[in-house]
Regions:
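Regulatory sensory and allosteric helical modules in signal-transduction proteins
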Residues: 49-50, 56, 60-66, 70-116
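Intrinsically disordered, low-complexity terminal regulatory regions
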Residues: 1-77, 165-169
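Flexible loop/coil segments at beta-strand boundaries within sensory signal-transduction domains
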Residues: 124-129, 139
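Short hydrophobic/aromatic beta-strand element in the GNAT-like acyltransferase core
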Residues: 50, 120, 133
């Protein structure tokens, strides 16, 4: 994995974090209707062109819900800003990505894609592991208020609740 961030993207609890993600057994599945609908609602709520529900695996970031990046189901972990968002239990916000030192070599920021704004709230398990993000992306710089941050966190909680319910159903059916 190539790291384009000029900083580590592996949390100290990486091994346990990946085990927590594996428990839910949803990493290899393609995007699904529930999470894609959630991504669309998030995009409309925040008036952004792209919203994603992502899971951060060992090598890739998988998009379980995708609005605005049609046909893209995964991105190399070393390029996805979601890799930075799982390092913390609080949201990660880049109001103007081009001004962030850790993003100056990231191809999504400096390349043709032109990412300028990113806000990602971690999807956190009951045990405290950040397994993915609910994030929004824009091509223009943008301020993000405290109220908006709280709403994004609520969307991440909803995503985690759905993942937990699916995990319970899957494990009870075995």
């Amino acid at each position: 994995m190539v790291n384009t961030f000029n900083k580590t993207i592996l949390p100290e609890n990486e091994v346990d974090r990946l085990k927590a993600l594996e428990y839910f057994d949803i990493l290899n599945a393609l995007p699904d209707r529930y999470f894609s609908n959630l991504a669309r609602i998030i995009a409309v709520t925040f008036d952004v062109p792209i919203a994603l529900v992502s899971l951060v695996g060992s090598e890739d970031v998988i998009f379980k819900g995708n609005f605005g990046m049609k046909g893209i189901n995964r991105v190399d972990r070393g390029k996805s800003l979601c890799s930075l968002a799982v390092l913390d239990l609080e949201p990660t916000i880049f109001a103007d990505a081009i001004k962030e030192p850790c993003l100056l070599t990231n191809p999504l920021v400096i390349g043709e894609f032109g990412l300028r704004f990113y806000a990602g709230a971690p999807i956190i398990t009951k045990e405290g592991f950040s397994i993915g993000t609910v994030c929004i992306v824009g091509k223009e710089p943008r301020e993000f208020s405290a109220d908006e941050t709280e709403i994004l966190k609520l969307f991440a909680e909803n995503a985690m609740h759905e993942i937990e319910m699916r995990g319970i159903i899957k494990h009870n059916s075995k």
